[in-house]
């Protein structure tokens, strides 16, 4: 019996191996970096809460489509609840994204595919491995797009459309991009292929129906649409266009303050954000024009990639922060490599004299993709040496876990805090804090983590919930978001009144952004704390409060 030869050509293996090595190099560091951000803590707490019966949107405020937390919860149920498991899920989403980019770009050659993949990874790597909904959805969208475009057989097309639907289930703002992939393919397909595409898309969107049955249509609509689009927006929106003299994002401002003046020549850090914003918009428009006038191979494929990039831009328009620019730029950078490498290869092939293709064969043309990659990443690093250059270099060159890496271990949960003397001090402080809370509570008691000033709910230490698995979050507001937790009618005051212990900090009281986050909200939650709770101890950063035994204790 004859079997088909399934050996992978060495050139294809090499084009996959190079990006894989680029992923492996910073992997140990990424798995061990601090997990103390509100965003990652929220993923950990919401996903682990699903296993305890607390559902996103119904029992916990959650601002995204629920796909990523359901996936992380599934991983927790199989492999145990840990930061490493959550980050391995995040790694899986990133590998899916890189595979999708590679397969999309391989139509223009394996070298182009490898370089486009490297461009995406270089832009995205500084964000780490958080199983963040946007990255998860983008990975599914990239994989779905390439399977829809390549899916000559019915099964591949159906799987691709299903992945596009799942991308929306992970991040609902990707719906326009997913439709821009599936609808043109549907309109140009045969009746049989249309049926497969339609079936696949419905299958990918079907988890929405299951989630709605569990949480109810109202809770689902409020969580995915009303809260993030209407209630939250005024408190998270940043000025458009970005101010080149002021980093509007709070953590970018804090980074400017902590690091001091830049050691790199060129634009100031705030101006770098503004420059990246304008560059992203310009690149998006130019890519659309290039795709429209494309004379090379696979014009429809490049057009789809450019159109998807344009559909991602609203993510930046709502909040032009460094992270949002990178989320969208990770896709755009890859398309730029393709758009530069293909015509550049043709130009190199036509060089006269000793550089001609007749003398060197096709080897000269193979230089085009690396040159395109160098042009894209080099241009970004020159334009934004701090936000792109420094963070990307640090992601690939910083040491992995060593003796100075600090972690907190409590109740079977391990939380990486960071590295260095400062991280050790923070870890020790958190350790003392959770030990105190344990001494004051019993399993099943209700705990709340938030700011001292509850009229301004801009950020919180959600990772503390993760370290206290025997306690139940007292409020559906795990994250502290302006316009949500501090709005009248949010239910936060009633939640606090029923809490058994509060963990409050003033370290985010200096939060300042050019939006409604600086405007005080409902005073009722703060009044509940003032009237009913007494300070019983804590640390320099966090105070622990429990219900007063007697009103006179105040």
Annotate the PLM regions.
Residues 106-107, 141-159, 167, 187-191, ...:
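Membrane-interface transmembrane helices that cradle and orient dolichyl/undecaprenyl
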Residues 31-46, 59-71, 81-84, 217, ...:
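Extracytoplasmic catalytic/substrate-binding loops of multi-pass membrane glycan-assembly enzymes
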Residues 64, 173-174, 378-552:
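Extracytoplasmic
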Residues 10, 101-123, 139, 155, ...:
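Transmembrane-helix signature of polytopic, membrane-embedded enzymes
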């Amino acid at each position: 019996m004859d079997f088909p030869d399934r050996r992978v050509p060495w050139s294809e293996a090499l084009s996959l191996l190079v990006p894989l090595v680029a992923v492996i190099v910073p992997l140990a560091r990424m798995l061990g970096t601090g997990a103390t951000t509100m965003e990652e803590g929220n993923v950990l707490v919401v996903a682990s809460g699903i296993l305890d019966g607390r559902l996103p949107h119904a029992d916990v405020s959650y601002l995204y489509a629920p796909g990523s937390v359901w996936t992380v919860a599934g991983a927790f149920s199989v492999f145990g609840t840990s930061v490493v498991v959550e980050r391995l899920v995040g790694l899986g989403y990133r590998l899916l994204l890189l595979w999708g980019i590679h397969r999309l770009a391989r139509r223009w050659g394996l070298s182009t595919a490898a370089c486009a993949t490297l461009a995406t990874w270089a832009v995205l790597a500084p964000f780490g491995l958080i199983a963040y909904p946007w990255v998860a959805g983008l990975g599914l969208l990239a994989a779905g797009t390439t399977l829809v475009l390549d899916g000559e057989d019915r099964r591949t097309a159906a799987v691709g459309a299903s992945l596009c639907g799942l991308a929306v289930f992970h991040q609902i703002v990707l719906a326009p991009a997913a439709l821009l992939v599936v609808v043109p393919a549907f309109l140009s397909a045969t009746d049989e292929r249309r049926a497969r595409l339609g079936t696949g898309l419905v299958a990918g969107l079907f988890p929405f129906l299951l989630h709605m049955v569990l949480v109810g249509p109202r809770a689902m609509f409020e969580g995915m649409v009303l809260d993030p689009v209407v209630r939250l927006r005024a408190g998270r929106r940043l000025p458009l266009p970005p101010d080149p003299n002021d980093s509007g994002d709070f953590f970018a401002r804090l980074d400017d303050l902590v690091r001091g003046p830049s050691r790199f020549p060129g634009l100031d850090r705030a101006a770098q954000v503004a420059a990246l914003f304008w560059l992203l918009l310009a690149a998006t428009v130019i890519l659309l024009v290039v795709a429209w006038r494309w004379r090379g191979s696979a014009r429809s494929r490049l057009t789809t990639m450019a159109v998807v990039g344009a559909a991602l831009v609203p993510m930046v328009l709502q909040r032009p922060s460094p992270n949002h620019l990178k989320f969208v730029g990770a896709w755009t950078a890859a398309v730029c490599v393709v758009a530069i490498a293909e015509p550049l290869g043709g130009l190199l092939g036509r060089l006269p004299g000793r550089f001609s293709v007749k003398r060197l064969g096709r080897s000269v043309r193979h230089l085009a993709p690396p040159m395109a990659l160098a042009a894209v990443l080099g241009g970004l690093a020159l334009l934004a040496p701090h936000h792109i250059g420094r963070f990307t270099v640090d992601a690939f060159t910083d040491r992995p876990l060593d003796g100075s890496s600090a972690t907190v271990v409590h109740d079977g949960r391990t939380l990486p805090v960071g590295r260095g003397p400062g991280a050790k001090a923070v870890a020790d402080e958190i350790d003392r804090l959770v030990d105190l809370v344990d001494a004051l509570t019993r399993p099943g008691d209700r705990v709340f983590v938030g700011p001292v000033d509850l009229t301004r709910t801009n950020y919180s230490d959600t990772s503390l919930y993760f370290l206290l698995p025997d306690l139940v979050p007292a409020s559906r507001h795990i994250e502290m978001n302006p316009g949500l937790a501090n709005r009248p009618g949010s239910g936060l005051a009633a939640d606090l009144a029923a809490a058994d212990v509060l963990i409050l900090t003033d370290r985010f009281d200096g939060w300042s952004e050019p939006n409604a986050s600086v405007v005080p909200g409902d005073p009722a939650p703060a009044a509940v704390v003032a009237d009913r709770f007494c300070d019983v101890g804590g640390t320099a950063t966090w105070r622990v409060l429990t219900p007063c035994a007697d009103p006179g204790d105040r």
